[in-house]
């Protein structure tokens, strides 16, 4: 029958839902292959292929299906079926996240009535990363000489989970909340599991002494050496190599080994993607990457892109794609919301002002002195 004018004012009741990542993939990482299961939804009801065929056989207008009236539009229905074919099968985790939150295709997909939802495994995994208290406790390293606060234990669990999943991680806690001890705990666990592993820490020159002191204090069994100044030869027998940003720029030999973990302290040092230092560091191959910074965004959103280009390359697209995306942020506030949803599983940030983090700290006091 003909569609009446009052019906045309209603929002289309036909759309596609693509369920991604229902089960855990066999291999983990951003290139993990997830299942993609599209289904056609009419007024909240999923249709079988047989029922879809029945819809196509009906005349355009209103049709009676599953005890309700639905709009039959052959052209739109055919478009939806073509979209179903496009999504049916598998998709990489990186593409799944991009399509869910930040893809340039999202406007097209929405117009065609495509809704992407996370399946059970993907939903639970991202939920754990956004709230580390949901992650199952990882056993504390046997020889760690430190007592972790509850939020630090959550951070330790989170770093281990990120490593298990093959994701890069940004530990962005406020200064003073113990980013260093959380990372040392993670490294001590890695050392405990495999003493043949090799990790590279790149830190400001002013922090070399502090890292050495903290490792000696909290993980005295861990073998490490400092690569700085005249000491410019890698020690193959050491678990950890600690060097500076300046040395990382000069020593191309750091790029000749695939490190088990690459860690940047004060990672805002790579905020400018165009510098030689940033480009050199991003060339260092590694299985896992950690960025430590209290300021993941210092000046503008391009800082965030450079950080994620190091941590999880391709997640935020190319520099040009991301620049075009950020232009929409001021005009459309929902775009910044999408971006936050996109990066939040990979950034762990706790604040000293949050009493749920440290309840025994006194309130912050600010004193203004006029000079």
Task: Put a short name on every predicted segment.
Residues 1-128:
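Accessory nucleic-acid engagement/destabilization modules that flank
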Residues 115-334, 340-361, 365-367, 371:
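ASCE P-loop NTPase motor core, strongest for the SF2 helicase catalytic module
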Residues 55, 80, 155-156, 339:
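A structural signal for short hydrophobic/aromatic patches embedded in well-ordered alpha helices
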């Amino acid at each position: 029958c003909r569609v009446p004018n009052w019906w045309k004012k209603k929002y289309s009741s036909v759309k596609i839902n693509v369920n991604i990542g229902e089960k855990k993939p066999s291999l983990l990482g951003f290139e993990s292959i997830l299942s993609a299961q599209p289904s056609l939804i009419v007024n909240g009801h999923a249709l079988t292929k047989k029922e879809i065929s029945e819809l196509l056989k009906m005349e355009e207008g209103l049709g009676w299906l599953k005890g309700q009236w639905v709009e039959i539009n052959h052209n739109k229905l055919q478009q939806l079926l073509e979209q179903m074919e496009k999504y049916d099968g598998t998709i990489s985790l990186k593409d799944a996240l991009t399509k869910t939150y930040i893809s340039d295709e999202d406007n097209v997909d929405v117009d065609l009535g495509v809704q992407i939802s996370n399946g059970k495994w993907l939903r639970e995994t991202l939920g754990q990363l956004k709230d580390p208290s949901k992650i199952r406790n990882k056993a504390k390293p046997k020889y760690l000489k430190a007592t972790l606060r509850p939020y630090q234990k959550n951070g330790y669990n989170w770093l281990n989970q990120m490593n298990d999943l093959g994701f890069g991680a940004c530990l962005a806690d406020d200064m003073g909340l113990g980013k260093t001890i959380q990372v040392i705990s993670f490294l001590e666990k890695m050392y405990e599991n495999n003493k043949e592993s090799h990790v590279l820490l790149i830190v400001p020159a002013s922090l070399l002494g502090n890292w050495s002191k903290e490792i000696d204090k909290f993980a005295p069994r861990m073998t490490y050496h400092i690569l700085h100044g005249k000491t410019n030869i890698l020690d193959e027998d050491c678990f950890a190599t600690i060097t500076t940003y300046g040395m990382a720029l000069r020593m191309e030999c750091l790029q000749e080994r695939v490190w088990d973990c690459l860690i940047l302290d004060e990672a805002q040092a790579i905020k400018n993607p165009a510098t030689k230092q940033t480009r050199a560091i991003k060339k260092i191959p590694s299985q896992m990457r950690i960025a430590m910074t209290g300021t993941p965004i210092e000046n503008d959103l391009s800082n965030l892109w450079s950080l994620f280009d190091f941590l999880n390359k391709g997640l935020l697209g190319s520099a040009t794609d991301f620049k075009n995306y950020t232009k929409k942020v001021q005009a459309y506030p929902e775009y910044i919301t999408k971006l936050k949803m996109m990066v939040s599983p990979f950034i762990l940030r706790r604040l000293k002002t949050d009493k749920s983090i440290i309840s025994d700290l006194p309130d912050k006091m600010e004193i203004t002195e006029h000079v």
